[in-house]
Amino acid sequence: MTEDYRRALSSLDTSELQNFGIRCQNFSGSEDNIILVSDGMVSQRGLEINFSGARNEIDLRGLQLPGGRLSVLGDEGSVLIDTDSEVFIDAYVYKRARLLIQKPRAIFGLWSSITENTSLSIGSGALFAEGVKIFTSDHHSVIDLNTGKQINFPGDVTIENDVWIASDVTILKNSTIGKGSVVGARAVVTGSIPSMELWSGHPARCLKQHVSWVPSHPAEPAQIEHMMAGLNLLSN
């Protein structure tokens, strides 16, 4: 990135951050935290950033500032959000955890907890309705009483490109949702969903294969053609 396009701000530069619509709070022991912001970024809802740790980086790219709250609770966490459209998020990023959101269509309401040494990745063209929750761990430990050892462990969550997540969906650790798939309202995702499938239920199960979606309703032919091309389904 060129210097005139990206601006690096210390988390202590409160007046400059406020010019971008960012309110930042550093808790005791927080230092060397950096926020990167694109010049010309528009703020519609305002963003609260909370640091509790050191050497964290939040990189905000694109035309629109995400709204909501980012809480980085530990050292060496990283957040990269690149969006030209609405993103409203409440994310908790722990020690050496990573949050990556790349050019979504829109995220109207995401609550996420990204545990130490795990990642949450959301690909381009994704559409999230309100009330979506994503966890990369169970938060507490389950112990096998025969061995005295923990049997549940954290795991990454990956949402590939052009995925539609309906309202009030919960996505749990070690889950991957493949390109172009759809997850129905109030579903609970506990593993891998292949590309171009419709899943719903608690736990989520496949309702239909070889499907995808477009944002228009009724569906516009140009959007169908664009979607099919993106999924490499058009014949030459």
Label the predicted regions.
Residues 1-66, 125, 131, 139-142, ...:
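Terminal amphipathic alpha-helical/low-complexity segments used for targeting or macromolecular assembly
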Residues 47-50, 54-176, 203, 210-211:
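Flexible, glycine/small-residue-enriched loop-and-beta-strand segment within the central core
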Residues 146-148, 163, 168, 190, ...:
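A short, terminal or domain-edge coil/loop segment
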Residues 176-200:
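C-terminal/domain-terminus segments
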